[in-house]
Amino acid sequence: RDPEMSRGLGDVYKRQGGGHHITRPGYDIARLEKCIEAAKEEWKVDIYLEPGEAWALNAGFFLTTVLDVLQNGDTRLAILDGSAACHMPDVLEMPYRPPLLGADEPGENAVTIRLGGPTCLSGDVIGDYKFRQLPKYGDFLMFGDMAIYTTCKNNTFNGMPLPDIWLRRADSTMQQLTDFGYGDFKGRLGSKINPELFMSI
């Protein structure tokens, strides 16, 4: 261990980030362990793997409802009560296309539909998906792999409600953990401010 590196800093360590999908089927854990051991030996440091998205990989579902179906030129559109901008920001930031249960199955009569959110953001688009039947008003659509960023990076842009969180137990029973409402949106904007203050400006 280089005393110049650790002087005044205590132990020297290396944080390796959270991008490794160590829970993914087929991930070469043995190779990762060898790489870590080799790095520890060569640089005399402790290495920590951030408990990142691997711990929730492919976990969590996001249930949405179709609000409207329309046609724009050659593009079929379905507007959902779920928003890429508010509820799945990684869709826009990475970009990322979440899996959708029952969609993209092979079939001769599959129709392609662009799914989007109801906010005023023109880019509030989740993605294009293939369906055997055209979704209609009131249909439920369920996205998978939603536990990673939907819970920690969601927002209430345009007053969009946050999704309630439910726990599905091993015996298939359900328990509601959260119940978000307008009060949560209002509270983030300063609900304690006296409205008369704005009238006097």
Kindly give the residue locations of the regions a language model identified.
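Short, well-ordered coil/turn segments that N-cap beta-strands
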Residues: D11, W43-V45
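Glycine-rich beta-strand-to-loop/alpha-helix junction loops that act as flexible
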Residues: K14-T23, P51-A54
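Charged (often Lys/Glu-rich) extended helix/loop segments that serve as interaction or gating elements
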Residues: C35, D46-I201
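Alpha-helix-loop-beta-strand connector modules within alpha/beta enzyme cores
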Residues: E33-E42
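Single conserved hydrophobic/aromatic residue that forms the stacking wall/gate
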Residues: R1-Y13
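Metal-dependent catalytic neighborhoods of phosphoester/phosphodiester hydrolases
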Residues: P25-Y27
